[in-house]
């Protein structure tokens, strides 16, 4: 048991963003691996990197991406909706995870580490984002797509009701 835990920990620790690739544009192909979480200016989601198309770049296998709509209407992504289990090509800019280590506070860096998210970043706003595949059939992705379908059903049923899906989708967040 101890040896296996050590091997897994070493494997996870090695899967990190090299410092020389922080803050640089990198083109990646991968799959949206989680239910996107919407916020005021965009969406945030886990992304499984399948291929790095920028020569010489090395990235972790799983990253947390934000995709911003932009401040101005002409910067919005032209109605591109992102869903779990889709394969995309993005140009991203990443950094290593950083979080506060307060004794009684939330440890963001540990939270990311527990989920295998070894870098955070964002989709570059003026670069071309291309959906390559509408559905990648792997068990974890199928579950995320089902969660997405359930969330969309709640949204359609409730419309603009004040209790909108936030309260109803809380079990979906806990299941993740």
Question: Where do the language-model regions lie?
Answer:
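Membrane-interface helix/helix-cap signal primarily in integral membrane proteins
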Residues: 1-176
């Amino acid at each position: 048991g101890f040896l296996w835990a050590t091997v897994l920990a070493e494997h996870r620790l090695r899967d990190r963003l090299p410092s020389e690739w922080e803050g640089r544009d990198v083109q990646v192909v991968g799959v949206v691996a989680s239910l996107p979480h919407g916020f005021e200016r965009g969406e945030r989601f886990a992304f499984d990197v399948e291929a790095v198309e920028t020569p010489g770049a090395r990235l972790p296998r799983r990253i947390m991406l934000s995709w911003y709509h932009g401040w101005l209407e002409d910067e919005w992504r032209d109605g591109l909706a992102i869903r779990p289990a889709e394969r995309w090509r993005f140009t991203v800019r990443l950094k290593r995870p950083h979080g506060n280590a307060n004794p009684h506070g939330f440890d963001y860096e540990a939270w990311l580490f527990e989920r295998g998210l070894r870098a955070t970043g964002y989709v570059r706003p003026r670069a071309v984002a291309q959906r390559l595949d509408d559905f990648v059939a792997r068990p974890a992705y199928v579950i995320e797509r089902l969660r997405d379908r359930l969330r969309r059903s709640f949204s359609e049923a409730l419309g603009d009701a004040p209790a909108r899906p936030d309260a109803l989708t809380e079990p979906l967040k806990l299941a993740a």
